[in-house]
Amino acid sequence: MAGSQLKRLRATLKAHGLTGQTNVKKSKNRKTSKEYDHEEKARVVSAIREQFNPFDVKANRSKLHAAGAGDAKVAVGKPGISKQIGEEQRLRFHESKKAQKNRAGGLIDKRFGERNKHMTAEEIMLERFTKERQAQSRQSKKSLFNLDDEEDDGDASGALTHFGKPLASDFEDGDLGVGMAGALGPKRGLADDEMEPEVPKKKTKAEVMKEVIAKSKFYKHERQKAREQMEEEIDQLDDEFEGIMSELRAAPRARTNPVESKPSQELEYDQKVRELCLDRRAAPADRVKTDEEMKQEREEKLKKLELDRVNRMNGLVDGEDAQGVEDLDNGFWEAEDSDAGEYGEYMEAIADSDDDLKFENEPETAEPTGTSHKQKKIAALPCPITHAELMDVLTAYQLEEQPHVVKNIIKAYQPKLAEGNKEKLDKFSGVLLHHILFLSSSDYASQADVIVEVQNSLISILKLMSEKYNQALSEACRQVVTEIQQRFKAQHYLGLKPSDLVFFSLVGYIFSTSDHYHLVVTPCCILLGEFLEQIKLTDYERLIFVAIAANICVRYQRISRRHVPELAYFLKRALASLLPFSTENSQAFNIRLDSDKLSLSKTLVLEDIEPTLKLRFLFLKEYDDSVQAQLLVNLLSTLDACVSQLWKGVSAFPELTQPFKPLLSAFASSYPTFAKPQQIMERMERISNLQQHFPLTLQNHKPAAIPSYMPKFEDNFNPEKKSYDPDRTRNDINKMKAQLKKERKLTMKELRKDTKFEARQKIEEQRKHADDYKAKMARIVNQISTEEGADKNKYEKEKRLRAGKR
């Protein structure tokens, strides 16, 4: 068994002669050790240290070990030493960077406002002006005693004084050597000529300064004299200015030659030239299209409109492309003159024509006869913005004249005539809607034909206005829907009016009811569903009201053919209530009735009766047999429309029509001469036979096979080859990418190490600073405590001495 780690270390050191007996008697013949022995000893000690500390050495394991490669070289690394070397390098770089901190020179841009994004041009100019004035102020303070300063105010603020009195200038022309030759006389001149040239004597500093001061005083005196002379001339000109101006005003003016007037022909020619310059260049006109081209364009437009309608019905139109209720183009009045949809032939009647609006199948209305001054009155018609204002305008006219007055108001306020007319007509469209509902809510049994004709004319006008004022009209309709819903929620059927049914009919006439979602039609459909389900059928008035609502609901769905559950529920209740049986017999149909007083008589005559229910039936106090017969025929017609239009393509058609078969059989047996129930049952049977109704089953899928792949083998396999791409260029690119990825990875690793080292050094510096501060404060506290202790001991000692003297 091998010994311990310590024993093996001792044995190894002793075997290499590093330990053991050292006082052995040296041989005289053996040479002494040299410096070489010390290096060899250090190498041996390092090898022994690595041998006994295997954790500092890392050997890479070969992944592809081949047989017979036992003596192969293995890559060996020393991560500990490498890490230590890296730490030492980072520490040296950190110390050098720290030593150069705040010492590196550089240019500082002191220009104000050059790169400031928050300062405007005016603020930058103001700041520059302020800096310039400050610099001038500092310069003026520095040049207060500058002898070379050119500015001199001539006051005593900068002059030399003695006891407050200015000293006289000791300047003389002789200081500059002027007239020196004349003072010395001709002898001096001759002497100078006879004298030999001598070396000029170097001036002393005092002489140079004296000469400089003299020159400065001379130049300053010259400038002062020139300034005084200029000021005198300016004062003289100012004094003589008034006299010169008075003489100039008194001088006669030279007469200018009058402009010769051009002949009339030249003036006309100049006028024509100016007009030609100002005229705009005419735009090229489109060529006249043939009948075939116009027909083809019309067909393409109709196809596009139908496709858009189908997309809206299926909810496939985006909000940007949909031309719904909320869309109102600001340039609508400037649109082209082509047909615009289903009612395009009427769109020019309001905005682009001065004639009256013309509708199909409308008789000519008479001119207003309420006033004598017709044209003036029409021209002065105001545009009402409320229904009360419209009633004030219409009070002066008869009932049949109201459509003509409304047309005149629309023509008088066309958007092309004045600014703001478009907004006025927007509001007027809502006012016209309220007026139509107002006419519908009044009892007009005495003049029913006139009111119906007026209503139809106003509805036609409203339809035309809806083509251009869709947004304003839709907002007014939504307000009406909200009002109806609030009244129905508060008072149920008692809160409803006959005009509400007219409103729902108008919505179906004006807006597209086949859209998947519509801002006006969708709330109306929800409200109609509430009427069909929640109104209790206790009398004929309510039954007629809901029957009309059901007919409107069927017309809403005539294109989209969506299923309305409330409609089927109402038809079952209504037909069961009208059965000519007693309550006990009606209970056999499993239908709960609201009243048993609505049963019809078996003696009713139902042949040749129109299925239309008129709105004036709601104002009747008694309902005779004719009204009851029309009610029954109307309900059966509504059921027939549901069967043949709405429910025909529904997969649950047998389930929907099953509850109606007993009811229809009962009506057929009660009224044998009335063929409508039997026709509806036959239609139900035909549609049921054509439909194939299968129960729901799970979808049967073919089992998917488990994929199997053959392994891929390389014919020319080489473990040293990393890519088998035959394209040399692509291979080089991939190699470059791999190398770049590797270098980037190593660089990021080094950056992370540097960041961590910087963080450790920062924490170490903060800790060192905190320790120094703590030691400093402790030293100060100890010093203060020592001084206080010494003072305290001294005080105690003096106190004891005073006590001992007593």
From Swiss-Prot:
<dbReference type="GO" id="GO:0030692">
    <property type="term" value="C:Noc4p-Nop14p complex"/>
</dbReference>
<feature type="region of interest" description="Disordered">
    <location>
        <begin position="249"/>
        <end position="271"/>
    </location>
</feature>
<dbReference type="GO" id="GO:0000472">
    <property type="term" value="P:endonucleolytic cleavage to generate mature 5'-end of SSU-rRNA from (SSU-rRNA, 5.8S rRNA, LSU-rRNA)"/>
</dbReference>
<feature type="region of interest" description="Disordered">
    <location>
        <begin position="92"/>
        <end position="114"/>
    </location>
</feature>
<feature type="region of interest" description="Disordered">
    <location>
        <begin position="1"/>
        <end position="41"/>
    </location>
</feature>
<dbReference type="GO" id="GO:0030490">
    <property type="term" value="P:maturation of SSU-rRNA"/>
</dbReference>
<dbReference type="GO" id="GO:0032040">
    <property type="term" value="C:small-subunit processome"/>
</dbReference>
<feature type="region of interest" description="Disordered">
    <location>
        <begin position="130"/>
        <end position="207"/>
    </location>
</feature>
<feature type="region of interest" description="Disordered">
    <location>
        <begin position="787"/>
        <end position="806"/>
    </location>
</feature>
<comment type="similarity">
    <text>Belongs to the NOP14 family.</text>
</comment>
<keyword id="KW-0690">Ribosome biogenesis</keyword>
<dbReference type="Pfam" id="PF04147">
    <property type="entry name" value="Nop14"/>
</dbReference>
<dbReference type="GO" id="GO:0030515">
    <property type="term" value="F:snoRNA binding"/>
</dbReference>
<keyword id="KW-0539">Nucleus</keyword>
<keyword id="KW-0698">rRNA processing</keyword>
<dbReference type="GO" id="GO:0005730">
    <property type="term" value="C:nucleolus"/>
</dbReference>
<protein>
    <recommendedName>
        <fullName>Probable nucleolar complex protein 14</fullName>
    </recommendedName>
</protein>
<feature type="compositionally biased region" description="Basic and acidic residues">
    <location>
        <begin position="789"/>
        <end position="806"/>
    </location>
</feature>
<dbReference type="GO" id="GO:0000447">
    <property type="term" value="P:endonucleolytic cleavage in ITS1 to separate SSU-rRNA from 5.8S rRNA and LSU-rRNA from tricistronic rRNA transcript (SSU-rRNA, 5.8S rRNA, LSU-rRNA)"/>
</dbReference>
<comment type="function">
    <text>Involved in nucleolar processing of pre-18S ribosomal RNA. Has a role in the nuclear export of 40S pre-ribosomal subunit to the cytoplasm.</text>
</comment>
<feature type="compositionally biased region" description="Basic and acidic residues">
    <location>
        <begin position="32"/>
        <end position="41"/>
    </location>
</feature>
<dbReference type="GO" id="GO:0042274">
    <property type="term" value="P:ribosomal small subunit biogenesis"/>
</dbReference>
<dbReference type="InterPro" id="IPR007276">
    <property type="entry name" value="Nop14"/>
</dbReference>
<feature type="compositionally biased region" description="Basic and acidic residues">
    <location>
        <begin position="198"/>
        <end position="207"/>
    </location>
</feature>
<dbReference type="GO" id="GO:0000480">
    <property type="term" value="P:endonucleolytic cleavage in 5'-ETS of tricistronic rRNA transcript (SSU-rRNA, 5.8S rRNA, LSU-rRNA)"/>
</dbReference>
<comment type="subunit">
    <text>Component of the ribosomal small subunit (SSU) processome.</text>
</comment>
<dbReference type="GO" id="GO:0034511">
    <property type="term" value="F:U3 snoRNA binding"/>
</dbReference>
